[in-house]
Swiss-Prot record:
InterPro entries: dUTPase, dUTPase-like, dUTPase-like_sf, dUTPase_trimeric. GO terms for biological process: dUMP biosynthetic process; dUTP catabolic process. PANTHER family: DEOXYURIDINE 5'-TRIPHOSPHATE NUCLEOTIDOHYDROLASE. Pathway: Pyrimidine metabolism; dUMP biosynthesis; dUMP from dCTP (dUTP route): step 2/2. The gene is dut. Gene3D superfamilies: 2.70.40.10. It comes from Shigella flexneri. This is Deoxyuridine 5'-triphosphate nucleotidohydrolase. Keywords: Hydrolase, Magnesium, Metal-binding, Nucleotide metabolism.
Length: 152
């Protein structure tokens, strides 16, 4: 069953100059988010900037959250990723969606108005309830940490 999410358009250019977020294909998990900018923004290597989307969402359902992720092509080809690596949007957040863009590449990168710069997915949320215990039931792995399960 499709879940409907309320979207508020904060910038009148959205839907006129810049399309609403869309799924690129029928199998796409992520919606493309666009840079709602007046002018192009040049991002020097190592720099970060906050880019508005012109949109606010209200998920409302506490069993859902949204995550903003980098677009694979921008990251691989240009070193453009999210400054916070992953953006988490809680179900009760109602403010504008802002994208922290980080140029981890070697060359300057120009973000154009309306350019697709991130993607957003919706994920189920399970809130944990902690149960204080003295010991855990034994497992094969035990307390083995980083690299314990091997490479193969």
């Amino acid at each position: 069953m499709m879940k409907k999410i309320d979207v508020k358009i904060l910038d009148p250019r959205v839907r006129k100059e810049f399309p609403l977020p869309t799924y690129a294909t029928s199998g796409s998990a992520g919606l493309d988010l666009r840079a709602c900018l007046d002018d192009a923004v040049e991002l020097a290597p190592g720099d970060t900037t906050l880019v508005p989307t012109g949109l606010a969402i209200h998920i409302a359902d506490p069993s859902l959250a949204a995550m903003m992720l980098p677009r694979s092509g921008l990251g691989h080809k240009h070193g453009i990723v999210l400054g916070n690596l992953v953006g988490l949007i809680d179900s009760d957040y109602q403010g504008q969606l802002m994208i922290s863009v980080w140029n981890r590449g070697q060359d300057s990168f120009t973000i154009q108005p309306g350019e697709r710069i991130a993607q957003m997915i919706f994920v189920p949320v399970v809130q944990a309830e902690f149960n204080l215990v003295e010991d855990f039931d034994a497992t094969d792995r035990g307390e083995g940490g980083f690299g314990h399960s091997g490479r193969q």
